[in-house]
Amino acid sequence: MKLFVGLGNPGKEYEQTRHNAGFMVIDELAKRWNISFQTTKFHGMMASTVIFGEKVALCKPLTYMNLSGECVRPLMDYYHIDVDDVIVIYDDLDLPPGKIRLRMKGSSGGHNGIKSLIHHLGTQEFKRVRIGIGRPANGQKITDYVLGRFTKEESDAVMEAILRAADACEKAVVTPFLQVMNEFNA
């Protein structure tokens, strides 16, 4: 089973914020695959189906961003999902709005959700789909920026990135991730 994890914060007040780009991709995949989420005992929302002949699961942790690993690790253990079958989708300050970048592994880059996953999974070697949100201007605090909504100027580019990231995830269901990475990072 492949597990796609979108990082974000639960609650209406965080919907459509920069920090919830991962949730937006997961919601797009659920829409494409016509599946609904259910709350799990693992502190997350989960949906599963068979797509292209492969079992897949979508997860949105409900633990708040900096505790994401507390949802994902128990879920992996319960369903016997290997770290090689996990793809994490999240926002990235170091990419401009609308840009996506796929990686096989890496450090947290200062992202608290990724820090939590690295801690709970015991490795940095899990696949990632990063959605660019850019950096704040005019000395705005990073926390305020990531918890803010996209500007009108950013919105179109970011929505395009959400769709492209969902395309990459769909392709990764049956195509080796390195091949998907080479195609979408080009």
Curated annotation (Swiss-Prot):
It is an enzyme of class 3 (hydrolase). This is Peptidyl-tRNA hydrolase. Keywords: Cytoplasm, Hydrolase, RNA-binding, tRNA-binding. The record marks D91 as: Stabilizes the basic form of H active site to accept a proton. It catalyses: an N-acyl-L-alpha-aminoacyl-tRNA + H2O = an N-acyl-L-amino acid + a tRNA + H(+). Belongs to the PTH family. Its main location: cytoplasm. Its EC number is 3.1.1.29. GO terms for molecular function: peptidyl-tRNA hydrolase activity; tRNA binding. The active site is at H19 (proton acceptor). TRNA binds at Y14, Y64, N66, N112. GO terms for cellular component: cytoplasm. Monomer. It is found in: Cytoplasm. One of its GO terms (biological process) is rescue of stalled ribosome. Hydrolyzes ribosome-free peptidyl-tRNAs (with 1 or more amino acids incorporated), which drop off the ribosome during protein synthesis, or as a result of ribosome stalling. The lineage of its organism: Bacteria, Bacillati, Bacillota, Bacilli, Bacillales. Pfam families: Pept_tRNA_hydro (PF01195). The record marks N9 as: Discriminates between blocked and unblocked aminoacyl-tRNA. HAMAP family: Pept_tRNA_hydro_bact. The keyword Magnesium does not apply.
